[in-house]
Amino acid sequence: MTMIDLIISKLEREHLTALAELEKICFSTQAWSYKSLEEELTNPTAYFFTALVGGEVAGYIGMYVVCENCYVTNVAVFPQYRRQGIARALIKMAMLTADAMETDFISLEVRPSNTAAIALYKSFGFEQNGLRKNYYKNPNEDALIMTKFFKRE
């Protein structure tokens, strides 16, 4: 794998158009709109990070921190940037943020057919601890709930 010029930054307004396009590519009918993404800029419980490669938006991750709980809402990488460690860097940023905020856990949903994502999450210590029936559409699919618990003293 070649080295890439990767920067993980806080979501900025100038990233929204690219993220709305990425949402359509990755999530089609369940994609978040530009307006939905824009609302997260002022949501006090939302933490969204953008992956930039050479100044271009390559992907992003979004999460909510509520009390001592962290929920990942979205992880997406443009197809041309996949298999380059970008999703790994985004997950790592989310985990570092959640841990620094002393959350008890970080949780997410994933399609059972998304074996690459499942393997990535497992490599960070996430374990399946639930199932949401008929969660995804086009195609219809359940969602695996995966959680990583943080050890607190």
Protein language model annotation of sequence segments:
Residues 5-8:
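Extreme N-terminal starter segment of soluble prokaryotic enzymes
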Residues 1-2:
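Short, Lys/Arg-enriched N-terminal segments with co-localized hydrophobic residues
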Residues 56, 74, 78-92, 101-105, ...:
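Conserved glycine-rich acetyl-CoA-binding loop
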Residues 109, 122, 127-143:
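Conserved catalytic-core motifs of GNAT/GCN5-like acyltransferases
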Residues 10-80, 91-93, 97, 101, ...:
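Acetyl-CoA-dependent GNAT
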